[in-house]
Amino acid sequence: MQSIRLTLICHARTVAQKLARFPTNEPVENQPSALVTLATRFASASHVLCGPELRTRQTAEWFCATPQADEALRDCDWGRWHGQAIKDLQLNEAEALQAWISDPHAAPHGGESVMQLGARVAAWLASLQGESGHIVAVTHPFVVRAALMQVVQGLAFNAIDVEPLAAIELRFNGIWRLRLPGNDLAGAL
């Protein structure tokens, strides 16, 4: 059995995030100085993966000149809600929005449900179990949430907030485990 160190990093902030909108394929807003710190911290990764969207590729390029896009790391398919402001949905599709928030099987937007996203991410995590080394994957808040739910086997999907450039670490050595690194960046392995 091989050991894996998987670090999931949320892409840098986008305008859609600042405006509380469902995303489109937009670029990151800027390249914050936090990216330099993260890039240095994870420079020794054996693989750098990212979602296929522009914002994940731009962020991943801080870690590796040629990150490998992985379709399994793509954002949730928001269907007709792509680019829509949450406040507009609260006014115009309040019942649909509430159904989506409260029922992980619901996909009133015509895209992917939280359960479908979770199944996709679970399959991706299972596919990594034959790998070894340190993998950095730059992806989206919902993908990070789904990965956490797989690891902790919980149902608290909507109780997890994933900020831009947040980094969580998952390790596999027979079972997936969530590791919360401390603030001692010099001593972090």
Q: PLM ranges: what are they?
A:
Residues 87-101, 175-189:
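A polyampholytic, Gly/Pro-enriched intrinsically disordered region
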Residues 62, 146, 150:
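Active-site signature of alpha/beta-hydrolase-fold catalytic machinery across serine-
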Residues 154-181:
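Domain-level recognition of soluble alpha/beta enzyme cores
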